[in-house]
């Protein structure tokens, strides 16, 4: 009996929080932000990768 009361309370709280939110959650916008972060990380890592490649080539004697 207590479990059903607790479950009902949790579901009611979640429902209230979902209906009060100002802006709807857009998963595609979040996915786009993640893609931009990955793109920026790859761009910023480019010079470091080139430096490591040069160091490896020098170490091998090529």
From Swiss-Prot:
Residues 1-22 form the signal peptide. The modification Lysine amide is found at residue 60. Residues 23-24 form a propeptide. Keywords: Amidation, Antibiotic, Antimicrobial, Immunity, Innate immunity, Secreted, Signal. One of its GO terms (biological process) is defense response to Gram-positive bacterium. One of its GO terms (cellular component) is extracellular region. The keyword Electron transport does not apply. It is found in: Secreted. Its main location: secreted. Belongs to the cecropin family. Cecropins have lytic and antibacterial activity against several Gram-positive and Gram-negative bacteria. This is Cecropin-D. It comes from Hyalophora cecropia. The lineage of its organism: Eukaryota, Metazoa, Ecdysozoa, Arthropoda, Hexapoda.
């Amino acid at each position: 009996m207590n479990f059903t009361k607790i479950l009902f309370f949790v579901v009611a709280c979640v429902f209230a929080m979902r209906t009060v939110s100002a802006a709807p959650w857009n998963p595609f916008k979040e996915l786009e932000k993640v893609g931009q972060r990955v793109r920026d990380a790859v761009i910023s890592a480019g010079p470091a990768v080139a430096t490591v490649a040069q160091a490896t080539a020098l170490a091998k004697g090529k």
